[in-house]
Design a protein with these regions (language model features):
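Helix-coil boundary/capping segments in enzymes
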Residues: 1-267
């Protein structure tokens, strides 16, 4: 996706996969940014594993062991049929980690390359496979153009980070071009758990997988979507763009009750 899908001047800084050996001598594939290892492949390749023996579950994996359903559309549909599922909304896995990259140009290149790959992936079975694009919202005008491009190619859903750059929160009018594009195209914008942009105050998550392990991390992730949704709602975005659709992914649903009570009290 990245080596062949990004501009030539970005390839040296793009995510790349290499073989590594851990302290136990086990060889695996890992993602690198430049010469920095950030995560092993196994972090997002646990599909099909059983939980009867948790000791067998680890993040040490090689590409050859990844199920073809992860990257071949026909194989994905075969696996879905085994589970009695007719179709799927295809979303990035490892790609979501890249929202923590500081280099905005690299992130834009990653999103563009992934979106191109995604269009090819879902186009073979457009009724059964629906793709979710990735948008870098650091430059909202650029994000709006990329969203419109993806819609023209058949994509109707896109991820935006659950927390944007700290100096331009979602209440900032700078995002109006993006909201307008989503409103006019009917696109669903989604905010996925743990997709904060780089260096957001109070967020420990980075591109390195080790930053995902603190015990307090998981039970507090709904804070970010609550903050983002509150910013958007009280900035009047939904009134100014009445057809806009914005959703939450993997934050579960229980968090919404208390904010709804607080919204009522606030007005």
């Amino acid at each position: 996706i990245y080596a062949n899908g990004m501009p030539t001047h970005l390839v040296d800084r793009a995510p790349n996969m290499r073989k590594v050996t851990n302290d136990e001598g086990k060889v695996s594939d890992a993602w690198f940014l430049g010469d920095q290892q950030v995560v092993t492949l196994g972090a997002v390749t646990q599909a099909g594993r059983r939980f009867e023996d948790p000791a067998e579950l680890d993040f040490v994996e090689v590409w050859e062991d990844v199920r073809e359903g992860a990257y071949k559309p026909d194989a994905m549909l075969e696996e879905l049929e085994m589970d009695g599922v007719w179709g799927a909304v295809v979303q990035p896995s490892q790609g979501l980690f890249w929202y923590h990259i500081e280099d905005s140009e690299i992130l834009s290149g990653i999103c563009h390359a992934y979106n191109n790959w995604l269009v090819d992936f879902v186009s073979s079975q457009p009724d059964r496979l629906k793709g979710t694009a990735m948008l870098n919202v650091d430059d909202p005008r650029e994000a709006a153009k990329e969203l419109e491009r993806c819609v023209d190619l058949g994509i109707q859903t896109a991820f935006i980070p659950v927390a944007p750059l700290s100096h331009q929160p979602y209440r900032d009018p700078i995002y109006d071009p993006l909201w307008d594009a989503a409103n006019e195209t009917g696109t669903v914008l989604l905010m996925h758990i743990a997709t904060q942009r780089a260096n957001v105050p109070g967020c420990e998550i980075g591109v390195d997988m080790s930053t995902y392990t603190p015990a307090g991390l998981r039970p507090t992730q709904d804070y970010w979507v609550r903050y983002a949704m509150t910013d958007i709602i009280f900035a009047g975005v939904c009134e100014r763009y009445p057809k806009i659709k914005i959703g939450s992914t993997e934050h579960e649903a229980s968090w919404i009750v208390k904010p709804m009570m607080d919204f009522t009290a606030a007005v």
